[in-house]
Every structure is written in C-alpha cells, then in structure tokens.
Amino acid sequence: EAAGIGRATLFRCYSSKLELVIAVCAAKWKAYLDELDAKRPISSIGDIPAIDRFVFTLDSYIDMYQRHKDLLQYNDNFNHYVTHEGAAQEQLVDFNRSLYSANTRFHLMYEKAKEDGTFRTDIPEDIFFRVTLHSMMAACAHYAGDFIWGAKDNKDYTAELILLKEMIVNFAKG
C-alpha cells in the first residue's frame, strides 16, 4: 500500500512472497552494483593493481555501512528468509544474475593478483573471497543491524570497520 499498489496487483506479478523478496533483493543489488560500475568500470581492472581493487571493494562495504544500511540489513534478512524458505537454486537465478558484476570483478581481481602478486593467491579463490570479502560484508551487516555484542544503538562503528579492513588487507598481502 505504501508503494501505491494493492496486494492483488503485487501477487499478479509475483506468485509468492519468496518470489517477491528475491526480485526486490536482485533489483537492489543490481542498482547498487551499477552505481559502483559507474565509479570504477570492470574494464579498468587491468589498469589497477589487484590490491587496490581489493581495497576499493572493502571500502565499498564500509560505504554501504555508512550510506546503505538498509541494503545490508535487507540482504541479511534476505539470506535468513531464503534459507528458511528452502529456496531452490532455480528460484535464485535472477538474484545470482544481479550479482554478475560483483562475481566478475572478484574473479578478474584474483586473476590480476596472480599476475601482479599484490595479494596472496595460495588460497583457492572461493575460499579467499569467503574469508576476506564475505567476512567484511557480514561484519558491516551486523554492525548496521546493531547485532554486535556490546554495541550501542545508533553509534557509528566506522572506525572498527576500518580496523577490520586493515586486518583483512594485511592478511591478503600475506
């Protein structure tokens, strides 16, 4: 109703709440990643050392914490909801497609690191990104939702996220 449409109209377009939730999350991520692509196009990956691209990605997560807490919180809730509902991979095709830009960047960044040696590649690519980038995003999401033990409501935890970023960068450099 807040969007100016009724339930009937909504469910004419989406057959279930799960389908709607997936569509909204895919649209939100695509819009955010398109904004990042405009700032630093995928085509520039060859021109930038892999570690600089890696730091840019970590900084973009901190920026999300500062300016897009709603996206981080929605994504966190999305992950729990989709898991709870038992969404099948075929239901997530559009969502995964919305992450194409990020997944492509991560892969090209890792390949660039193999060439320029600016961050470690002794760990398999998927594990490296789970341990580094995904951990950073999870921390940003938890801070955005005030899910950190001992955290105070409405406090800015950017300094702690910058510290975490520095720790991750030091790990990545080996």
Residue ranges and their predicted role:
Residues 23, 27, 38-70, 125, ...:
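Hydrophobic alpha-helical connector segments
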Residues 7, 12, 72-75, 128-130, ...:
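Gram-positive cell-envelope targeting signals
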Residues 39-44, 79-86, 143-147:
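Secondary-structure edge/capping motif, primarily at the C-terminal ends of alpha-helices
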Residues 1-23:
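Helix-turn-helix
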Residues 60-63, 104, 108-116, 130-174:
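C-terminal peripheral helix-coil segments that are non-catalytic and often amphipathic
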